[in-house]
A protein has these predicted regions:
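Helix-loop-beta element that forms the nucleotide-linked donor phosphate-binding surface
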Residues: 150-170, 177
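Extended catalytic core of nucleotide-activated donor transferases of GT-like folds
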Residues: 7, 47-157
Length: 293
């Protein structure tokens, strides 16, 4: 059986859980098959027009530059266009499979594709929105990270023969037990609880912080390290500091980290004493899995 030649459509650039999973997954997959990527997102260091517009992101490496062949950009209120990128890293081949790895209801799922197409989606509820679910049914295969999501999808009406479980992986060369030296404001003899994940009702962020403040007295040598910014929350509070103030949760033991670099994130995970997670629902929860590793 010949190996597939895959054209992936995904949000490759960025620092969200979806972005990190996408990069790790496609970097690994590219070691085994021909793979190229159409990317939807841009990072904070976006540089356009430019043949290499994502070089300002500190996580972009030569593998990424080879994989990234096309960039989607909005050209009008409801119109998108595709632009070639990283042409100095040749990766031309005729693909025979399309793979869409995106969040629920993303534009890429609704695009027209020639040939077999696979939908890879992470969702934290028992039901998909009806319009989106009907679109999923048009795909040749449906990939999900857990047996639970696969079972929910079949229960909603998908053909069991099309549903596959493809777990999200962890880079074991990056996430492994050790006691790394760090220059971060972190190793000071105090016990560190850590929370990584956007401020969200689903993730019980407010309740975790409330519980920490109720459990530990101010004179105890315990800190709560939080990286919980959510610029898309819709609550009008705009920042983690404003949310803590709004809910009466300000405390010097809460150490706020605004979107730390990948390197710093790894260091925080490895140096933390306890990783806290108490989500009402999760599609996968990559930071928790990485902390466990």
């Amino acid at each position: 059986m010949k190996k597939p030649k895959v054209y992936a459509h995904a949000s490759y650039v960025g620092t969200t859980g979806y972005n990190n999973h996408t990069r790790d997954f496609f970097r690994s997959l590219s070691k085994h098959i021909d793979l190229k990527v159409r990317n939807f997102t841009i990072g904070k260091n976006w540089n356009w027009p430019n043949n290499e517009p994502h070089n300002g992101e500190d996580y972009i490496n030569d593998t990424d530059k080879k994989l990234l062949v096309e960039q989607t950009l909005w050209t009008g209120k409801d119109t998108r266009s595709e632009f070639p990128i990283y042409s100095d890293y040749p990766n031309e081949f005729k693909h025979n499979v399309n793979l869409v790895l995106e969040e629920t209801n993303h534009h890429y799922f609704y695009d027209d594709y020639v040939g077999p197409k696979i939908a890879y989606n992470v969702w934290e509820s028992t039901l998909q929105p009806e319009q989106f679910f009907n679109k999923l049914l048009e795909y040749d295969q449906l990939w999900f990270p857990s047996q639970w999501q696969a079972d929910c999808t079949i229960a909603q009406g998908a053909d069991p023969n099309k549903v596959k479980v493809v777990p999200e992986g962890v880079d074991t060369k990056t996430f492994f037990p050790e006691d790394p030296v760090t220059k971060l404001d972190y190793v000071d003899g105090r016990f560190k609880f850590i929370v990584f994940g956007r401020w969200d009702y689903r993730k019980s962020t407010k309740e975790i912080i409330e519980t920490f403040l109720k459990e530990f007295k101010p004179n105890e040598p315990v800190d709560l390290i939080v990286s919980i910014d959510n610029p898309f929350s819709g609550d009008g509070l705009e920042s983690t500091e404003n949310r803590l103030k709004h809910f009466g949760l300000e405390d010097p033991r809460i150490k706020i980290k605004h979107f730390p670099s990948r390197e710093d994130y790894i260091t925080y995970i490895k140096n933390g004493h306890v990783f806290l997670s108490c989500a009402r629902s999760e599609g996968w929860n990559l930071p928790l899995i990485e902390a466990m590793a």
